[in-house]
Amino acid sequence: MSATRIGVVGAGGRMGRMLIEATLKDDRLVLGAAFDVPGSPALGKTAGELVGLPCDVVVTDDVAAGLKNIDCLIDFTRPQGTLVHLELCRKAGVGMVIGTTGFEADGKAVIAEAAKDIPVVFAPNMAVGVNVAFKLLETAARILNQGYDIEIVEAHHRLKVDAPSGTALRMGEVVASALGRDLEECAVYGREGVTGERDPSTIGFATVRGGDIVGDHTVMFCGIGERVEITHKASSRMPYALGSLRAARFMAGHKSGLFDMQDVLGLR
């Protein structure tokens, strides 16, 4: 099988650099293109310069032109930009891995529609460990379905713009689904003042933002006399990059369809 050609959006950012590095170190992949926004200091540099590895792919802001050189575009940017890139990929017949979070319902609907024409892997967290945690949460919620209060605590760096994180929300969705509940109806986002006694049917969320925390997520099942916690902590962004590249390789066997990391990892 020939190497999968990867394109990276946001090449000059922290996640973009990590994706470039991971791609260049994987002999099953080829970096075909690297993109960044107009005005970025990364423009005109080679991807190799950004990560200190041999590579002569030049960073450009012309995504439409660069798509002809790739099989899969990986995007960890902002919802508005991601949807623009998605439409370009759809027109070019190029698959897409979307790690961007913070989409509203209408944005998710656009992604689902595009996946009728191209393969799309869309997941709130690409790390393999987090997706194993999703599976563990499903099992735990079904067993601890009576007498346990459920709280989700997440922490990220000071620059993260959405809260709760997409991963925390997905954890809540997994737990709520296993319990036969609708997260939109049972979620409580933060507490303040005299809140009254806790409603046992709710799922609570707490958010921490500070420093350079890459990503910590804990789901607590709080019973009487015991507490079960399922935690994932990321110490670098490399797990997200490696999971994204695994998703890109997975897409090589699909012409269209909407997938997530549970599909990629065979956890369905």
From Swiss-Prot:
Which annotated residues bind NAD(+)?
10-15, 36, 99-101, 123-126
GO BP annotations of the record are: diaminopimelate biosynthetic process; lysine biosynthetic process via diaminopimelate
Q: Where's the active site on this chain? A: 156 (proton donor/acceptor), 160 (proton donor)
* UniProt pathway: Amino-acid biosynthesis; L-lysine biosynthesis via DAP pathway; (S)-tetrahydrodipicolinate from L-aspartate: step 4/4
Q: Where in the cell is it found?
A: Cytoplasm
Principal location listed in the UniProt entry: cytoplasm
Give the binding site residues for (S)-2,3,4,5-tetrahydrodipicolinate.
157, 166-167
Q: Name one Pfam family in it.
A: DapB_C
Q: Which InterPro entries has this protein been placed in?
A: DapB_C, DapB_N, DapB_N_CS, DHDPR_bac, NAD(P)-bd_dom_sf
Would you identify the family this protein belongs to, as annotated?
Belongs to the DapB family.
Name used for this protein in its record: 4-hydroxy-tetrahydrodipicolinate reductase
The UniProt gene name for this protein comes to dapB
